[in-house]
Amino acid sequence: QRRDREVVAAYDLRSGLQHWEHGWTGLFQESMGGPGPRATPTWSDGKLYPLGALGELQALNASNGELLWRRNILEDAGVGNLTWGMSGAPLVDDGRVIVFPGGRNNKSVIAYNAADGSIAWTSQDDQGGYASPQLATLADKRQLLYFSGKRIVGLDPADGSLLWEHPWYSNNDINSAQPIQVDDDHLWVSSSYGHGSELLKIVHRGDGFV
């Protein structure tokens, strides 16, 4: 955060000199976390994908900071911001940039085409969360995982279709810790404020997963 702008900057590792800077107007702040973006920019195939706390998603040329395309994920989902802002880092997979704004109308999870920012697919009606979407292979199935304010969910990353879900209710719906894959079938989830943790076993049963 630099005054009223969210900023992405690149520095030389040896000298510390700034190579380039790119920013946009936006100031998110609240008393506990302070001002500024929360999510770590994601690098993939020569491009950088920063997500601002107010939902501004951009694709940049990583070598010079040139803007390639932009979207606002909250506007695309038709949903308001979370109390502590957009925090989950974008996930890049198979030519798509996947984010989790939360919301209704089957737009909780949005996959954008990395080439031009057009929407590839949307999925789910869910409350937003603070953890980043992630990939895992569980029960011999490659999956897209996201941790909402109410549940942990596994989707097919190709089209966003639901594979399985497990309810997870915590104080104030604050789920911010990344789920951890323990082995080929088990996933560990946890939440703060005294809620605790669970070890889940994902099983392929019939045509689906539990």
Model-flagged regions — what are they?
Residues 1-210:
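Noncatalytic, solvent-exposed loop/strand surfaces
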